[in-house]
Amino acid sequence: MIIINIYIFTKRKLNFIEELKLKLKILNLRVISNDLNKKIKKVALINGSAMSYWRKAKKESDLFITGDVGYHDALDALESGFNVIDFGHYESEHFFYEILIEELKDKNLEFLIFNRGPVFKFY
């Protein structure tokens, strides 16, 4: 079962995108949108590669944040008028293992982390 987190507020998409980049210390986000000045009220978030859920997210939100958005999925969302932010697969998931390690550090466990950074570099 996939849980879609819904966040409710009112902001212009462009303002939200800039705030998100600052808070998460990310230089670039891939944005699929017909109108960046339109206000959003609900944001849906699923980490990792979750574009297969964009139609469900569209029913419940104005903006969907996920990772690994493929070209044809992005085109379908754009043509339907839905707004998507592609956060990147690694970028949307690395917080999880950092939190998990912090929570379990006192359990005398050894952690093997195979992916310590994003695979793709942007220049």
Model-derived features: positions:
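Active-site catalytic microenvironments in core metabolic enzymes, especially phosphate/sugar-handling
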Residues: 1-123
